[in-house]
């Protein structure tokens, strides 16, 4: 089995594993703390040392922290990413509000402190703005980032789901370079490959992180014409490439893009995670990549 290597996210950024383990659905995996720790050790053994979490992911940070507490030495072998900025609807009947974004300095500082406490760690390797806030004040974010970095609570900063203009706006006011933009990339939805987002990151030599690489499972189960076409093409290519699954082919398609994405694996099944690592060994050529593009679009290139 190929070992997942580490790569720099950007010229001044951290080294993360080429595949990232996502913990969004950790609660749904229904694992005991020991089972969570075992899973963590298993994917670290594969070389997947970078883990993705967020303040809004239910109690996933707490559950991850419980596992880490069983073997605190594992902290030295992983890189932890978390996110801030999405406030859910209040549970109190007397406090009526809508889910909203918040990138104020006070929210950033308190959210990060709470993430650190839930995870049971003293420092995040990377903190991301989860979604662009329409009321974003760059100076507020810059001050918060500086405080968090100077206090040793966060090493690096990035964004998630930012457009090119939003990325440039935030970067213009920061004292440190953004090290990534976590964006949706999959064979069903790859708008970021066409709207300038990936072009910007290539120019900056900054790797995107790719979320929803399997389109939330739609590649396997959706009955839309697009999904049916894609499954047929992915199955055909799996045979040509010697892949063990269409899962591998989908990840190989993402990995081939010259922006050099770092795909996030969403499964808590170590067999599925191990299978995904095999995508790194597939040698997909240009024509094969465009066959997936064509199956998604339902037309060829002009």
PLM region spans:
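N-terminal binding-site loop/beta-alpha segment at the start of enzyme catalytic domains
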Residues: 1-79, 301
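Acidic (Asp/Glu)-rich catalytic clusters
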Residues: 10-15, 45, 67-79, 116-120, ...
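N-terminal small/glycine-rich loop or linker at the start of catalytic domains
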Residues: 11-27, 81-99, 123, 128
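Short acidic capping loops at alpha-helix termini that bridge into adjacent secondary structure
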Residues: 18, 75-78, 82, 122-126, ...
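Conserved residues at the C-terminal ends of beta-strands
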Residues: 22, 54, 127-130, 160, ...
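Short, acidic/polar
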Residues: 30-43, 101-119, 140, 165-168, ...
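Active-site groove signature of glycoside hydrolases
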Residues: 116-135
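Beta/alpha (TIM)-barrel catalytic core signal, keyed to glycine-rich beta->alpha loops juxtaposed to Asp/Glu
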Residues: 132-302
């Amino acid at each position: 089995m190929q070992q997942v290597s580490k790569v720099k996210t950007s010229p001044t950024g951290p080294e993360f594993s080429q595949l990232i383990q996502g913990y969004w659905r950790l609660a749904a995996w229904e694992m005991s703390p020991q089972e969570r720790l075992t899973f963590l050790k298993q994917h670290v053994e594969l070389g997947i040392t970078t883990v993705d979490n967020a303040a809004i992911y239910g109690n996933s940070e707490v559950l991850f922290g419980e596992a880490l507490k069983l073997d605190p030495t594992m902290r030295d072998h992983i890189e932890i990413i978390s996110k801030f900025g999405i406030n859910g609807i209040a549970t109190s009947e007397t406090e009526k509000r809508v889910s909203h974004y918040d990138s104020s300095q006070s929210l950033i500082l308190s959210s990060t402190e709470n993430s650190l406490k839930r995870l049971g760690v003293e420092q995040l390797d990377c903190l991301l703005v989860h979604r662009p806030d329409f009321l974003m004040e760059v100076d507020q974010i810059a001050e918060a980032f500086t405080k968090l970095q100077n206090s040793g609570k966060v090493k690096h900063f990035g964004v998630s789901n930012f457009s090119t203009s939003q990325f440039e706006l935030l970067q213009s006011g920061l004292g440190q370079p953004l090290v990534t933009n976590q964006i949706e990339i999959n064979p069903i939805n790859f708008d970021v490959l066409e709207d300038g987002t990936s072009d910007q990151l290539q120019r900056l030599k900054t790797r995107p992180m790719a979320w929803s690489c399997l389109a939330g499972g739609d590649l396997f189960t959706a009955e839309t014409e697009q999904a049916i076409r894609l499954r047929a093409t992915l199955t055909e290519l799996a045979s040509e490439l010697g892949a063990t699954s269409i899962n591998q082919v989908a990840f190989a398609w993402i990995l081939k893009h010259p922006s050099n994405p770092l795909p996030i694996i969403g499964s808590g099944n170590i067999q599925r995670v191990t299978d995904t690592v095999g995508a790194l060994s597939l040698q997909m050529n240009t024509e094969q990549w465009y066959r997936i593009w064509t199956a998604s679009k339902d037309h060829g290139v002009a």
